[in-house]
A protein has these predicted regions:
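Membrane-active amphipathic alpha-helices enriched in small hydrophobic residues
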Residues: 129-145, 149-161
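Juxtacatalytic substrate-recognition/specificity segment
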Residues: 36-40, 63-97
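C-terminal capping/extension segments of zinc metalloprotease domains
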Residues: 1, 17-30, 61-80, 165-270
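Short pre-active-site segment immediately N-terminal to the catalytic Zn-binding motif
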Residues: 90-107, 122-125, 163
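Sec-dependent bacterial lipoprotein signal peptides
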Residues: 1-15
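Post-signal peptide N-terminal segment of mature Sec-exported envelope proteins
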Residues: 23-61
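Catalytic Zn2+-binding segment of zinc metalloproteases
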Residues: 103-104, 113-129, 141-142
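Acidic/histidine metal-binding catalytic segments
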Residues: 47, 67, 126-131, 149-153, ...
Length: 270
């Protein structure tokens, strides 16, 4: 059976039309419903409330503040984060526990918000449409029938929930993230700082962060580019950004006290 999202996407392709914002929002809503039903989403009201408020504080500063944004914490120790079209952003517990300071978490949120603002997943669909790529390839591009499930990717290990972005997509999301977290008053240096932290983690705990590196191509040149964007950022001149806060560490402690994550599902497992 074709997943409803795949059917909807294929209709858009066959119709030869670009994806409108309303269609994007509907695709995201349907995909999020599938993901939320199968991933271990954290329902603790304090955790859920904090991540929603934090994410919204950044999303409200973007050019797509009109979207109905939703932010979630996934109960898995894998270090990763991802976004779905239409304003759905997910951060794994493992990334929150790895972050040393607030600005590293806000940097992550800003980056993922950047993918939505730039409509990267939607552009992949439109590219598939324009080049007349078949439904099977469209499925792999949009990741809505990953691992042969014929439905939204729901890999608890955190290695593949969504289409892997190109290096250009990642650079655009970095730029968008730097601008928008700074507009929200958070230190944009948290973005390259997190990248450096993850590179260090890969040396000592490679399996913990492998999902991040699979989904987010990362090299030293990208870190240097983020540093340069921050140096040239007008908003950074003379501003005192928020680097850390007691509220973040209370949130992090609350996350650490959550029940243990469920058994990890191996990559590619149904």
């Amino acid at each position: 059976m074709i997943h409803p999202l795949l059917a909807a996407a294929s209709v858009l392709v066959l119709a030869g039309c670009s994806v409108s914002q309303d269609q994007e929002v509907e695709l995201g809503r349907e995909n999020a419903a599938q993901v939320n039903a199968q991933l271990p989403i954290v329902n603790d009201p304090v955790v859920a409330g904090y991540i929603q408020e934090l994410g919204q504080s950044i999303a409200s500063k973007t050019s797509r503040a009109d979207l109905d944004w939703h932010f979630y914490v996934v109960n898995t120790t894998q270090v990763n984060a991802f976004a779905l079209p239409g304003g759905y952003v997910y951060v794994n517990r493992g990334l929150i526990e790895t972050a040393d300071h607030l600005d590293e978490l806000t940097g992550t949120l800003g980056h993922e918000i950047g993918h939505v603002v730039e409509r990267h997943a939607v552009k992949q669909m439109e590219k598939a449409q324009k080049t007349n790529i078949g439904i099977g390839v469209l499925c792999s591009l949009t990741n809505i029938c990953h691992s042969g499930l014929g439905q939204a990717a729901v890999q608890v290990g955190g290695t593949a929930y969504f289409a892997r972005n190109s290096r250009l997509d990642e650079l655009q999301a970095d730029s968008e993230g730097v601008v928008n977290v700074s507009r929200a008053g958070y230190d944009p240096r948290g973005i390259p700082d997190l990248f450096r932290l993850l590179l260090k983690e890969r040396e000592y705990q490679p399996t913990k962060v492998e999902g991040w590196f699979m989904d987010h191509p990362l090299e030293e040149a990208r870190i240097q580019r983020a540093d340069q964007i921050i140096i040239e950022l007008p908003e950074a001149r003379g501003n005192k950004f928020l680097v850390d806060s007691p509220q973040f560490h209370a949130f992090k402690n609350r996350v650490a006290a959550l029940p243990a994550p469920p058994r990890q599902v191996p990559a590619g497992a149904p």
